[in-house]
Amino acid sequence: MTLKSLRIGCVKYLNARPLIRGWPGEVTLDHPAALCAQLARGDLDVALVSSFEFLRNPIYRIVNDISISSAGPVYSVIVAHQGEISEVDEIELDPAAETSVNLLRCLLSESQLNPRFTRTSASANASPARTRRARLLIGDQAIRFRQEHAHEFRFWDLGEQWARVVASPFVYALWLVRPEVIDAKIIADRLRALRHKNLANIDKLIGEEKDFDREFCVGYYRENLRFDFGKEERQGLTEFHKRCVKLRLLARDGLGFGTWELELARRCV
């Protein structure tokens, strides 16, 4: 399998640009939920997808040293609300979201909050209709909504809330490789080299950005996001796994959490 023939998918958001810009072959760009489904069906060989996809279906290999993560406010994973977050009784979930929905459930449980959840396919520009109603937004939609409605809404930043209760970073997305792909290490090395090149030339990448202004991109890439997947990120993902099992968002797999962390490290290529 050549790199150009590889069936590769990537989330279609600003946060993924440093991880995919310059890939030599065709790339399927889509929302997290759609990419997870395509990868699970075997329609893709490799994809940058929600970290929750690995937690619920740990058949994949993980490209080591690369993730989309944060160790504080992430800016682009938010609950838009009016009034106090404790007063919200209904949250509309972004149908494109995977990891963020379950992160939200974990954080609400931590805060002892229990609003209803509804699914919506409405545009992000459609505002929550009343004070006790809120909406989960992710990716570029979240960025635009924050910038366009900064004076109308309050924003519960899920990265910031995670950092308040967990010392390790939160991992939103990982490169996952299907188990039948035989040259996973070669692919992983190429993706790591691409990430390194793009981050080393981040000013050039920002200068080519057409959807968001330079000042925002500089802060977003350098302050909000992290692109590593090392020991700290594995600890964060292990903590997320533990909390999802506790809330029965994931089935117990029979492994102790210490053993699971070792298995996670073993899956990296």
Show the residue positions of the predicted features:
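Domain-level signature for soluble enzymes in the chorismate/prephenate branch of the shikimate pathway
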Residues: 1-269
